[in-house]
Amino acid sequence: MDSSLGAIALGFVFGLQHATDADHVVAVASIVSRTGRFASGALVGAFWGLGHTVTIAAAGMAIVLFNVTVTPRAGLSMELAVALMLMALGVARILRLMREREEAPGQSVRGHGHDAPGFWLVLRTLGPAQAARSTLTGLVHGLAGSAAVALLVLSTVRSPYAAVAYLLVFGLGTIAGMTVITALLSVPFAARLPILFRFRRALALGTGLLSLGFGLYLAVHISFVDGLLLGR
């Protein structure tokens, strides 16, 4: 029992580490660059982590409890979906920047009054579209990583109940880790200094190009090096 509890607790640490995967950080960076508040940036990570946890837990439980098998080809297909999503996020960010006019600093963040306290004000500032985008991104990432996480669970704990607990604690770790990451990423976009306005736009463009380029690299690697489109 003690060893199982230790393994479950270790799942939180692995979840924190998992949040730092390059494709995860690149994806959320392009979303965070759309926000203009520190708290909103942190919420991007929280929603991403929520979506990631839902699919990791659901798919992981199916694998652990019902012996559902994920074939190598299916795993590569899910990873390709992540690559295409990264490309889409990058293109969307670049196109939005191209449409935006040069605005005076501070005009791009809309006020919402003071009728909603604390968390709800921050949530309204983030907006439903950004919350949905963050959650969907996490869902896709979680689906692609579910097989690997399930194998990690099977090699760590034996009891099915402990395995389920591990998946949930792992999910909490990814939520906590990504919330911290996106909060830090949001700092330059939340700064209100006029001198940083052009820098923020350049940084936002950089996140879009990075997401597009990294997604393209992954797509080519998965399709041809790993052999998804070659039938290997």
Could you say what each language-model-derived stretch is?
Residues 1-232:
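Membrane metalloprotein/metal-transporter helix-bundle signature
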